[in-house]
């Protein structure tokens, strides 16, 4: 994997930094694991904008990823690594011994031809998945479930990982990259290793159009709007907004705590670092 800075042959190329991975499959994805992906433009069923800055972009197919890794005891081989437009991580097409194919997240160091396995009997090796009760304390893992059988929810993006720091009774304690320490049931599954494509953070799109290809629309400052559109809007000439920063709906921003799910507070041992 290489980080390439483009020659400044045009204003749109001047600041482009690409991440090139020659190991990725150059053909079409596996058709049996594709699903239709409709664009909403950020609108809900009533036509109102519920998510800002969304719209347009290249047409995409969703890749059905196996986040549960519940095919226990059946060895599998990595057929190839692929690009996935729906996430920052790359994905791997896996062929099981019984003939079934699935997509999984491509871990750091994973290559075509590698053997992987899921379940209690799997060895401690990058790409293998098993319950947290069987994972040694101190191990680095990714694709961690929060509820047994629900599928991975933690550490799924490029370069992500968590560390198992303790195990006590029915819960294992994980240290997340944010600094948060969190308890997770020991029956939840995790996959050894880090998520691959960590160089993704080094890329630079270089121009506004590259954002539009990805379906991301412009973000307009509140002070540049009219009063009807934003609490910071209006005024004669340029203004500073005239109040502490708020969202378009008047909720304080920049450090204001909005977490309200007290029910799961008991699972957070330590809040994330600021």
From Swiss-Prot:
Keyword Ribosomal protein: yes
GO terms for cellular component: large ribosomal subunit
Coiled coil: none
A Pfam cross-reference name: Ribosomal_L2
The entry's keywords: Ribonucleoprotein, Ribosomal protein, RNA-binding, rRNA-binding
HAMAP family listed in its UniProt record: Ribosomal_uL2_B
Protein family (similarity comment): Belongs to the universal ribosomal protein uL2 family.
Subunit structure: Part of the 50S ribosomal subunit. Forms a bridge to the 30S subunit in the 70S ribosome.
Protein function: One of the primary rRNA binding proteins. Required for association of the 30S and 50S subunits to form the 70S ribosome, for tRNA binding and peptide bond formation. It has been suggested to have peptidyltransferase activity; this is somewhat controversial. Makes several contacts with the 16S rRNA in the 70S ribosome.
Protein name from the UniProt record: Large ribosomal subunit protein uL2
